[in-house]
Amino acid sequence: MRAAPMSLTILGIESSCDDTAAAILRGPGDDVAILSSVVSSQTDLHAAFGGVVPEIAARAHAETLDLVVEEAMATAGIALSDVDAIAVTAGPGLIGGVLSGVMAAKGLALGLGKPLIGVNHLAGHALTPRLTDGLAFPYLLLLVSGGHCQFLRVEGPERFVRLGGTIDDAPGEAFDKVARLLGLPQPGGPSVERAALAGDATRFKLPRPLLDRPGCDLSFSGLKTAVLRLRDGLVEANGGLTEQDRADICASFQAVVASVLAEKSRRALALGDVTAFAVAGGVAANQVLRAALEEVTDLPFAAPPLALCTDNAAIIAYAGLLAFEGGRVDDMTLSARPRWPLDATAAPMIGSGKKGAKA
C-alpha cells in the first residue's frame, strides 16, 4: 500500500515589486490549503510619482515584512515553530525589494533551523493554474504581467519551455503608460479596464503589432506610441479630451491587446503537446482578456482567481512546496536576482527585461 504524501506547512514571502506579502500554505503538492494570504500594497506611496519608485519600494518592504509575516501566522493560527520550510521570491524584480525579502527569509530560516527555498517569481505565476485548477503537466501558459509576457509550456514544477514572448514592452507596462497618457490613476491596468466599460472599442483603429509575422512573439511599444499620437491629435483638434474620448481610447486599446494575445495564443496552441491552456500574472485579472482567451481553444482553460493573479505570497509558497517535495533546498548563499529567466536554455528576447518595474 502506497504511503500518503507528507503534509508540509510552508511560509511564503513575496517582495519583488510594490506589494509586500506573506502566506501560509499546507499540504502535499496535490492537495493544498491556503491557510492565510496577506498583502500590503504600496499603491498610495507611489501614486504621486506615476509609477513604482524602487527606493521607496525597498524601504517600505523592509518596514513591512515583519508585520505581514506576523499577520499571516496569526490568521493561520500557527506559530513559527510549526513551519516546515520558508519559500521566498529570489527574483526577478526590483533588486532592493527582492533583497529585503531574501534577507528576511534567511534570518527566519537560520533562526528557526528551517529549510530555505528560493523561488522564481515567474514560476509562482506559472504554477498558479495547477494550484487552483489541478492542471496536469504539460500545459500552455500565457504569463502576462507588468514586466513580462511570454508563452510557456509548463512541463513540471521547475521545467519551463518558452515558445514566444514580447520583444519590447510587457502588456502591464503598456496599460500603465496608457493610463498616464490619459491622466488616469496608477496602477494602470484596473484604471484602463474601468474606463473602458463606458467606451466604444470600435471608435478608434489601432495597430495590432506583429500579427503579420509568423510565430508567437509579441510587441506593445508601437501600440503605446499609437495611443500617444491618437491622444495628441484629439487634444490638438478639440482642445482637450472628453471623458468619452478617454473611455473610447481605453476600450479600443484594451480590445486590441486582447485580440493580439488571443491570436498569438492560437499559434502557441497549434504547436501542440499540451493538456490545457491557462493565463496567469497581474494582467490576467482583466476580464476582457480572460473572455477573449477562453474562446481560442476547446482544451480545458484556467484563469486563477483575481487575488492569485496579482502579486501574492501564496503562489510563492506553492512553488516552494513543489520544489521542496522535489528535493531542492537552498542555503545561506541564496542571492537576490534582478533577472531570472524561467527557460534558461532559450535565447534572450530582443529588448527583454528592459522595461517595466518588474523587468
Curated annotation (Swiss-Prot):
GO-annotated biological processes: tRNA threonylcarbamoyladenosine modification
GO cellular component, one term: cytoplasm
Reactions this protein catalyses: L-threonylcarbamoyladenylate + adenosine(37) in tRNA = N(6)-L-threonylcarbamoyladenosine(37) in tRNA + AMP + H(+)
UniProt keyword Transcription, yes or no: no
Swiss-Prot/TrEMBL cofactor(s): Fe(2+)
Binding, substrate: L143, V144, S145, G146, G147, D176, G189, N286
Subcellular location: Cytoplasm
Membrane-traversing stretches: none
Domain of life where this protein originates: Bacteria
Enzyme class: transferase
EC identifiers of the protein: 2.3.1.234
Alphabetized HAMAP family for the sequence: TsaD
Name assigned to this protein: tRNA N6-adenosine threonylcarbamoyltransferase
